[in-house]
Amino acid sequence: MRAAAPRRFLQLMRVGIVDGVPWWFRRRTPTGPQLFRGLLEKLGGSFVKLGQMLSLQPDLVPAPYCRALQDLLDRVPAFPFEEAAALIEVELGRPPSQLFDRIDQRPLATASVAQVHVAWIGGQKVAVKVQRPTAERDFGNDIRLVGRICWLIRRLRLRPLYWLLEPLGEFVAWTAEELDFRCEARYAEQLGDLAEGHAIQRVPRVHRRLTTRRVLVVDFLDGAVLLDYLRALEADPTGHAARALEPPGFDPDRFAANIVDNFLVDAFEHGIYHADLHPANLLMLDSSVVGYVDFGITGLLSRPARRQLMAMTLALVTGDMDLFHRCFRSLTAPDPRARPEVFRRGLDDLARHWYDPDSGALRVNFTRIMVDMLALSRRADFLPERDIVKYIRSSISIDGLIVRFAPQFDVGSYLAERCADLVRAERRRELLALPRLVEWVESSGRLLVDGPERFRRFVERNDAGSLEADRAALPPPSS
């Protein structure tokens, strides 16, 4: 197994030389982003997953590369059904013929981690995700290789490559969960429970008794994959090919709004959300309902963080930089190197570019603002907590995704509108919370007892003119 790591490194070098050197000297097509995507696809395995993770980090990766990596596909040949059946029997104790009414031997989809087969249980169509027999070995080798790359970057002080250290570290941590399908099942169940009350999203139900570390069985969601729709739009400017994929009742703007609504409700009301909104993980269902699959990357937000993020979004739209700065500061991780004064000055400079000097309206899109803000926070060593960065990156990814199929949809304005709704709903919930109700009942009881006497004293003071004196003693209202 250890001999495989050097072989993987040699493969990496070979692909880089064969594809990269001719491009470097000739400067011909494919472009840099296309070449990078092609390199990762040729390397396959965990490098495809790494590329997909990089596509979700536009504050670190240039926009053209993010767009190219969004369509990154795991081009891996299927492994024989006999191997899949053997693994199912090892994991579940019985062969597929005894677990399912029928199972398609030809996989519906293949990837470096697993492949998916369609099956039926009591007439119910399900998706059976079976881990590739060599996945743990292959990913283990790549993880060791990534660790050596990080060591070299630090050892040789390759400062231009320091930006890679964070996503590579996240990738290593994420891979351990990706290889244990029980983690994905747990996240899918949590998000599925939350989706029960929302008609605009669907999460497949997990079949727990048929789920193990290397096998995952969920209900089958029958819909068009958003990635296929995006490719059809880009390949045929007339839109005929894309319209052929649209389900009944599909409207691009409504679908975009539903993606944003689901993201905000999950993040701000429940504190857990799908953080890997790659177009291959989104399905277009009837009536613009959004279907979600692949829950390997999930974001979590505490209640205080949710409140600050909502307030920060509203402050951004209204141009209140003081409030924006206070909210952002409350979300940052303690760091002795932090220079908050540098961040504040930089924020004021950016605001002059973000807002129209006459009308005060925003004149740049949401993605530009978020990328600027994260870049500034890095320069000032004033970084938000990791969960906050993940949320911001997810919102940026949504903006970049939506513009590809609903270019007229203003994600920033809609985010602000929905945040305002959520803030009002949060205030109503707080008002009706048990401690507030108890406080209200107690104060109401005191008012019933003391009210008549207080009103009598108020009338006497008013007749005596003492209320005007009290008003004069108050400080003037601030302008």
Question: Where are the model-predicted features located?
Answer:
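Structured, non-catalytic alpha/beta "coupling" segments that mediate domain-domain communication
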Residues: 41-65, 147, 215, 408-412, ...
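Helix-rich C-lobe and terminal helical cap/extension of kinase-like folds
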Residues: 2, 28-31, 212, 221-223, ...
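Short, amphipathic alpha-helical segments that act as regulatory/interfacial helices
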Residues: 44-48, 147-150, 189-192, 392-402
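N-terminal accessory/targeting segments that precede structured cores
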Residues: 1-115, 119-122, 126, 137-172
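Long, charged, glycine-rich C-terminal linkers/tails
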Residues: 96-108, 197-215, 279, 414
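Hydrophobic residue at the +6 position relative to the catalytic HRD Asp in the kinase catalytic loop
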Residues: 277-284
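ATP-dependent phospho-/nucleotidyl transfer catalytic cores
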Residues: 70-77, 89, 136-141, 149-273, ...
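Conserved beta3-strand ATP-binding lysine motif
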Residues: 129-131
